């Protein structure tokens, strides 16, 4: 069975987001083993400079790659490939059929992901050209992963 990790910087603050992610995790249990891993966000002052932000991204990147170890790392980033739900389903299936038994979808902080994480990625994925709060992106990713796995399984969720 495919193992999917969502490695996200920071915690979900709102109950509705947590409940939504838990619901999709429960639904995905029929298709894969989903693990949601939260890594600590590096605290920065409000007026943080570029060097401080870069250092924070590197520290977060180390925590992300440690949790993603042994998995094909998928970086969610603005410069990634934008796909529709069918294409996401096909991409996940290609990884699984090529022997990638575990995928780690990585969501950065509000400052994004470090270059090290992006360079280590087997795939860079963009959710949209729009900007979303990273907590909402996590819920949206859960829904899209469920949709993609439902497409592969041939269940009627995706219309």
Task: Identify what each model region corresponds to.
Residues 111, 115-159:
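Structured adenosyl-cofactor binding patch, chiefly the S-adenosyl-L-methionine
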């Amino acid at each position: 069975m495919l193992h999917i990790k969502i490695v996200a910087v920071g915690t979900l603050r709102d109950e509705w987001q947590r409940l939504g992610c838990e619901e999709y995790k429960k639904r995905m249990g029929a298709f894969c083993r989903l693990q949601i891993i939260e890594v600590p966000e590096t605290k920065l002052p409000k007026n943080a400079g570029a060097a401080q932000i870069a250092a924070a991204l590197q520290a977060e990147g180390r925590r992300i790659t440690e949790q993603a170890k042994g998995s094909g790392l998928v970086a969610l980033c603005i410069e990634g490939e934008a796909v529709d739900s069918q294409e996401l389903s096909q991409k996940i299936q290609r990884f699984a059929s090529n022997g990638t038994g575990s995928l780690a979808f990585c969501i950065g902080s509000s400052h994004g992901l470090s270059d090290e994480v992006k360079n280590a990625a087997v795939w860079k994925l963009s959710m949209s050209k729009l900007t979303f709060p990273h907590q909402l992106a996590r819920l949206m990713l859960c829904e899209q992963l469920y949709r993609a796995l439902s497409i592969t399984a041939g269940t009627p969720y995706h219309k």
